[in-house]
């Protein structure tokens, strides 16, 4: 069961958008039968380049969501964006059997992505991107594959230092 729910959370100076990617009822088999609980996958972001994901489990969905949001706040990462609207370069990543391809796009393209990838880019603040998910469409694995790609991404400053060049040379050769 995939549920998309967007909310603004304003606790102090942190202003994050929260999106529920999936809600699942899971069971633990015990001697007396099955114990049911809920597992919630949440992505949060400030729509300015910071994003995080987290999973929470509890007997109630609302409590599981609170746990997931707290886990997502602990897993926040910074993604360097070009002109605050798209990615700096194309990238591919894999997690388990889910593979994702993320490509930067021209102005006005929009977010061309499906399922849980679209939700990540919405809370990240990306406006123009093309993304493709190959293999397993399990929301957990797809989200983790996207985060693997974000961690592998390099800013122009990092590329310039690796190549012993100036940042201007890297940017003009796009």
UniProtKB/Swiss-Prot annotation:
One Pfam short name: Ribosomal_S5_C
GO MF entries: rRNA binding; structural constituent of ribosome
Entry superkingdom: Bacteria
Full protein name: Small ribosomal subunit protein uS5
UniProt GO BP: translation
Record's subunit section: Part of the 30S ribosomal subunit. Contacts proteins S4 and S8.
Chain ranges of the S5 DRBM domain: 16-79
Any single Gene Ontology cellular-component annotation: small ribosomal subunit
Keyword Translocase: no
Domain remark from Swiss-Prot or TrEMBL: The N-terminal domain interacts with the head of the 30S subunit; the C-terminal domain interacts with the body and contacts protein S4. The interaction surface between S4 and S5 is involved in control of translational fidelity.
Keywords: Ribonucleoprotein, Ribosomal protein, RNA-binding, rRNA-binding
Magnesium found in the keyword field: no
Record's function text: With S4 and S12 plays an important role in translational accuracy.
Family, similarity comment: Belongs to the universal ribosomal protein uS5 family.
């Amino acid at each position: 069961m995939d549920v998309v729910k967007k909310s603004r959370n304003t606790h102090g100076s942190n202003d994050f958008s929260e999106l529920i990617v999936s809600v699942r009822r899971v069971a633990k088999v015990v001697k007396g039968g099955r114990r049911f609980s809920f597992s919630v996958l949440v992505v949060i972001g400030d729509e300015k380049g910071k994003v995080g994901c987290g999973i929470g489990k509890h007997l109630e969905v609302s409590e599981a969501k609170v746990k997931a949001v707290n886990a997502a706040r602990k897993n926040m990462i910074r993604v360097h964006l070009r002109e605050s609207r798209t990615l700096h370069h194309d990238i591919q990543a894999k997690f388990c059997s889910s593979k994702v391809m993320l490509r930067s796009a021209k102005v006005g393209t929009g977010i061309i992505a499906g399922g849980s990838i679209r939700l990540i880019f919405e809370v990240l603040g990306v406006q123009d991107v093309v993304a493709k998910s190959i293999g397993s469409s399990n929301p957990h694995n797809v989200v983790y594959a996207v985060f693997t790609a974000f961690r592998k991404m390099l800013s122009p400053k990092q590329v310039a230092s690796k190549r012993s060049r100036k940042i201007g040379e890297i940017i003009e050769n796009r």
